[in-house]
């Protein structure tokens, strides 16, 4: 829903959609205030100064990959007496233009999040390079493999809630689902009149 306004969100809700993603804190705040009963996901770049606003409205933050952001989320969530669900963003493809930690750093960040009483790591997120569905599938299978490794490392109690793989967008969601995605981000396919696969 990051490219549309409140009226379009209302139409989507009437059609049965209840999960929406925003990449700007001010848009998250506006739309979550209009529809507080819906599930609001933050999918944008996390900035320290915006974390209190994001935590106030997001059910899940998809784009966490720095330890100091985890600590800031812990502080903001504690003030709200809330446990904030997060995904660790991993840059599987190694593209410099993409956010996310290196795959080798993901487990350490999950453990940092597990050590915070008001942060709950729910899984991993990645974005694939655009334009090549074969490379996209390789990216997604790489994240799925890392996800399984981390679940084994963190043990049974914590792996019960570490269940989500957020990957795949409007142009490559089929490859993501084939690789094991539990969440896909398909706003353009839903909201854009000009989108074609």
Enumerate the predicted regions with their spans.
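Conserved alpha/beta-domain cores
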Residues: 1-171, 179, 191
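Divalent-metal-activated hydrolytic enzyme cores
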Residues: 182-184, 189
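Short, charged, intrinsically disordered terminal tails
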Residues: 193-196
């Amino acid at each position: 829903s990051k490219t549309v306004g409140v009226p379009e969100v209302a139409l989507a809700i009437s059609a049965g959609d209840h999960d929406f993603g925003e990449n700007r804190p001010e848009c998250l705040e506006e739309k979550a205030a209009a529809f507080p009963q819906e599930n609001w996901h933050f999918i944008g770049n996390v900035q320290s100064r915006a974390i209190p606003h994001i935590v106030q409205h997001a059910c899940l933050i998809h784009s966490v990959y720095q330890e100091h952001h985890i600590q800031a989320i812990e502080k903001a969530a504690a003030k709200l007496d809330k446990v904030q669900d997060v995904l660790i963003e991993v840059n599987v493809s190694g593209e410099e233009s993409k956010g996310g930690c290196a795959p080798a750093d993901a487990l350490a960040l999950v453990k940092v999040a597990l050590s915070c009483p008001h942060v709950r790591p729910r899984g991993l997120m990645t974005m694939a390079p655009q334009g090549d569905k074969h490379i996209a599938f390789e990216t997604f299978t790489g994240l799925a493999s890392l996800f399984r490794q981390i679940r084994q490392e963190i043990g049974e109690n914590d792996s019960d809630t570490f269940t989500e793989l957020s990957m795949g967008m409007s142009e490559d969601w089929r490859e993501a689902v084939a690789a094991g995605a539990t969440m896909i981000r398909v706003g353009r396919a839903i909201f854009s009149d000009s989108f074609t696969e």
